[in-house]
């Protein structure tokens, strides 16, 4: 069988950078949605009970943290891509792409959950203060989804560079 001379390794950095972009873009989309959705709830609740605004800002902060998770993975991936210094194979590019997608999509889904729960939670908290602890617990479980994506993203990005013995 004749070799075409194209191994695919020339395109590997594209997939690596695509993974970095996916991590940041999807995580920030989740953070933006969560911040906006829960922020609307805080604003409408603040009209009725202005003394609870600072207490109800928790979902907005938790949603903002999701963007940091994407930034962490994007930095890890982008520092691992240097085809001039060392060989960067297609396996490495795919490992970085899957790392970015795992973190980014987990951050997106967590942001949607935090936004919806935060919006409903702060509005309900204005009427029944006993619901605050329950809201926080649900928000923690939603944030854990993004943490799972961050952990898997770190594991997958650490696999890059293990494709061939050098």
From Swiss-Prot:
Membrane-side (Lumenal) residue stretches: 1-13, 78-96, 157-166
Q: Which residues lie on this side of the membrane: Cytoplasmic?
A: 35-56, 119-130
Membrane topology of the entry: Multi-pass membrane protein
Superkingdom per UniProt: Eukaryota
Query: CDD domains attached here?
Result: ATP-synt_Vo_c_ATP6C_rpt1 (cd18175), ATP-synt_Vo_c_ATP6C_rpt2 (cd18176)
Q: Which GO terms describe its cellular component?
A: proton-transporting V-type ATPase, V0 domain; vacuolar membrane
Transit peptide as a keyword of this entry, yes or no, is no
**Which of UniProt's keywords are assigned here?**
Hydrogen ion transport, Ion transport, Membrane, Transmembrane, Transmembrane helix, Transport, Vacuole
Q: Where is this site: Essential for proton translocation?
A: 143
* Pfam families xrefs: ATP-synt_C
The protein's location, in the record's own words, is: Vacuole membrane
Membrane-crossing residue ranges in chain numbering: 14-34, 57-77, 97-118, 131-156
Q: What does this protein do?
A: Proton-conducting pore forming subunit of the membrane integral V0 complex of vacuolar ATPase. V-ATPase is responsible for acidifying a variety of intracellular compartments in eukaryotic cells.
- Assembly and partners? V-ATPase is a heteromultimeric enzyme composed of a peripheral catalytic V1 complex (components A to H) attached to an integral membrane V0 proton pore complex (components: a, c, c'', d and e). The proteolipid components c and c'' are present as a hexameric ring that forms the proton-conducting pore. Interacts with APD2.
Identify its protein family. Belongs to the V-ATPase proteolipid subunit family.
The name on file for this protein is V-type proton ATPase subunit c4
Q: Which organism is it from?
A: Arabidopsis thaliana
């Amino acid at each position: 069988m004749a070799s075409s001379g194209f191994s695919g390794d020339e395109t590997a950095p594209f997939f690596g950078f695509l993974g970095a972009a996916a991590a940041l873009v999807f995580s920030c989309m989740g953070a933006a949605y969560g911040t906006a959705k829960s922020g609307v709830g805080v604003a409408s609740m603040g009209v009725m009970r202005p003394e609870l605004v600072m207490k109800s800002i928790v979902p907005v902060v938790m949603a903002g943290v999701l963007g940091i998770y994407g930034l962490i993975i994007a930095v890890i991936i982008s520092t691992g891509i240097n085809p001039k210094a060392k060989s960067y194979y297609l396996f490495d590019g795919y490992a970085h792409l899957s790392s970015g997608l795992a973190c980014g999509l987990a951050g997106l889904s967590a942001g949607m959950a935090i936004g919806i729960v935060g919006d409903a939670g702060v509005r309900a908290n204005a009427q029944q203060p006993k619901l605050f602890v329950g809201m926080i617990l649900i928000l923690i479980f939603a944030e854990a989804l993004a943490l799972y994506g961050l952990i898997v993203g770190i594991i997958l990005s650490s696999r890059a560079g293990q494709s061939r013995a050098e």
